[in-house]
Amino acid sequence: MTAYMDHKDLTNESIDETRATQIRDGVHRVLDAIAEAESAAGRAPGSVKLLAATKTRDVGEIMAAIDAGIRMIGENRPQEVMAKAEGLRRLCADRGFALGTGDGDTTRPSDAEHIPFHLIGQLQANKIGKILPDVNTIESVDGVELAQRIARRAVARGITVGVLLEVNESGEASKSGCDPQAAVDIAAQIAQLDGIRLEGLMTIGAHVDDEATIRACFAHLRGTRDT
């Protein structure tokens, strides 16, 4: 991955029509599948939100996905947020969209449709200040200490940052997240912080083939949310 990233220009804004068509067709297939699943489950249209993980994708590819109907993006690595944010923000504004926080963005239309920009990967404390001008939600907060650090930075900038508390439902050592038994208490503490908006809980299912085991992880998380 490192070698690949060293050779790809993530700030590139131009892609050919063949690649744009591939992206458009892929986005439409996923959106159609979500709509069918909503209908089958008796859910309201649009109640399931699709976040496009844009790791290793350049600005041009991401904009092609937005042109195809993506309305929420997420980056795994703070370095990629920093590399792509300026170009994405400008091109989104050209299309009447406002990306992420829009902090300090004088180009965004006053009536712009908002495209949330999430950090979905792990966040080191020394990178907090570098991503806050752009991302509006951090999905990988695994404890009070990290939340406090984010809150201090957010208050200093005069903004409010959304966070998801990551819970390690699978119990796998390779996964981050707090202990499920501590999640309610940690969430309550995070919710009290200035500059933080607790938006919910997240987990990554167990890395197994047994669907019942994977579903149990998410079912338990939902039960915790409803506590």
Task: List where the protein language model places each region.
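Conserved alpha/beta-domain cores
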Residues: 2-226
